[in-house]
């Protein structure tokens, strides 16, 4: 099945710039409606597939429509200024909760029905959400927030934007590498290093899921902080914590490993709202969807490379220590990028 899912992943990233272009020349609310209904219809069609090839086409269409959210949805979240950090943190938290809930919902459907309904039921829900959002838009409820005075005056790239985007690119690349590898490595690390707690893969898997769920709330804390303080010192703090705790993870077992892993993932998750807030400081609204689409594409490509790197190192017998050292080194680039970021007060 994996080869039939690859085109979906490729299109998920490759179509993001196209989605941004269409949103800029049409309408962000309209594109988000297309996102919900398009994913829903594609998922339902996949559920009615009669061959692996048809499943591959269905998954590919899901990837195309799924590519809309990050460049268009995030641009909507940061539109208008105000408490951007809190909104980004809340958006990221809901996204991570959705990722955590997906395998649980799929498992429940498969336990009581079959694989077809695992596509048809979520697809139907997505269409209903899309229709609800469309009605919300038509009623006038989805108007963008009233822009702050600073946001209204922010029509050109801010001074220092070139240096800021270089910093943002480095943070995105190195952060995507760390995040992509950590989502793969933690369940496997717990399975091997938590023998003193349990040898049941269901228990260690649940502990890994708990790490992701709890650490996701760090986005709210960081989001609130960057609404009140200058971004650069917050990014430096979040960046420095990553190589520190990633290095410590290589040497821990059982309960200590759980605590250190939780702290490491809090710093990893905490970085997510910061990068989009940096973008909001330096990039005017009319360019944000385009820059977000490129940022998302870089993140997806590097994350995939991180996954392959982790698998390769483990297959060669290098062990988890080697993987965690590589991740700690990658995280050091985030620290360097944080110091490279210009110091600038909020523009929202």
Question: Where are the predicted features?
Answer:
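Central cavity-lining transmembrane alpha-helices of secondary-active solute carriers
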Residues: 6-20, 209-221
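Conserved MFS/SLC helix-loop-helix module at the cytosolic interface between two early adjacent transmembrane helices
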Residues: 13-50, 226-229
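Cytoplasmic helix-loop-helix junction between adjacent transmembrane helices
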Residues: 58-95
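Symmetry-related core transmembrane helices of the 12-TM Major Facilitator Superfamily/SLC fold
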Residues: 117-135, 322-339
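Extracytoplasmic gate region of multi-pass secondary transporters
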Residues: 163-216
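C-terminal transmembrane helical hairpin of 12-TM major facilitator-type secondary transporters
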Residues: 229-275
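A late C-terminal transmembrane helix in Major Facilitator Superfamily
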Residues: 282, 286-317
